[in-house]
Amino acid sequence: MEGAITGNWQSRLKAFQALAVLMAAMIVVHVVNALLLGHAWDRHGIHPRGLDGLWPGVVAAPFLHISNVHLLNNLVVLAVLGGMSALVAGNRRFIAATVFVVLAGGLLTWMFARSGSHIGASGLAFGYFGFLVGQGLFRQSLVTLLVATAVTFFYGANIFFGIAFPKGCTSWEAHLAGALAGLAYARLEVWMQRRR
């Protein structure tokens, strides 16, 4: 059974590389969308309960950002929480967690969010938060408990206030959906490993 912290540094390095590629793709998509297309791709975000908002919205939403500030804010949090997730998980688990959070969090947003176009990578960032907290809750090793405690200490209030008191057009639903998806993936992963 794979441990709470992957011992293979090559796997961790590959996970960091995967995160860097993901973040670079977000930058490229934003530059093309903003500078060349006048944000035309923004219409491909998640549009709740409409078939046109399910595909490609669930997959496209994390790559679309309303402004440079929106993108930069998400990249900073992704670098920290995604980096910690990469360190804890290693390559395979990190990629699996990322895909699960994007799909499950996006689907939950599509099912339950208010009308509008939900775009941005903050749902994924909240998913990494949920994944890290879930590692501490469900694995219960000293290292994962310390990581979960640190993440909760540094980001917990921000996460809580981002969901409870959203600003303007902030998609608190995507934040909550991402956090729940991250927690669910952490639980599912531990359950699957114990069944082996």
Spans of features found by a protein language model:
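A detector for small-residue-rich transmembrane helices and their helix-helix packing motifs
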Residues: 2-196
